Amino acid sequence: MSDTLASNLARAQQYLERFKNNTTGHYIKGEFTLGTGGREYDNLTPTDNTAIGKVMAGSTQDVDAACEAAQEAFEGWANTPGSERKRLLNKFADRVVERADEIALVESMDCGQAVRYMKKAAERGAANFRFFADKAPEAQDGQSTQQPEHTNFTVRKAIG
């Protein structure tokens, strides 16, 4: 086993430790919850088909609660000034970049993708948040950047 592989596996196991004894649930209305379904399942790594943690299955009630929470939060977010949205989205992107190695190693164990690919995916995700952060101040008025080959419009309705 190469030094890099051994090192990556050791670091991945450290990051995965927090999932071993804690069932991963849902994040609804600003809180972590195990939901109402009551059924959990093993999250198996494709590397060797062993359990790396447990995950709660979502129920119809959990989906309804998440949609209701999104609807409740929608007006507040829609009325948040573009400069504040920009700050929050950039802060989130900063956190993703700070934890890109952790995200890459955990996701690699979770889905079997190469670590280098998952790290780039995390960095790309952060770049997407930064792109929309930069657009937030100018989008506050419901307008968007015009391009001749596109028709742009805004629908202010939460979709979930």
Regions found by a protein language model. Name each.
Residues M1-K54, R87, K91, A139-G160:
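Terminal low-complexity tails and localization/encapsulation signals of metabolic enzymes
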Residues N49-Q140, E149:
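Glycine-rich loop-to-alpha-helix module at the N-terminal edge of alpha/beta enzyme cores
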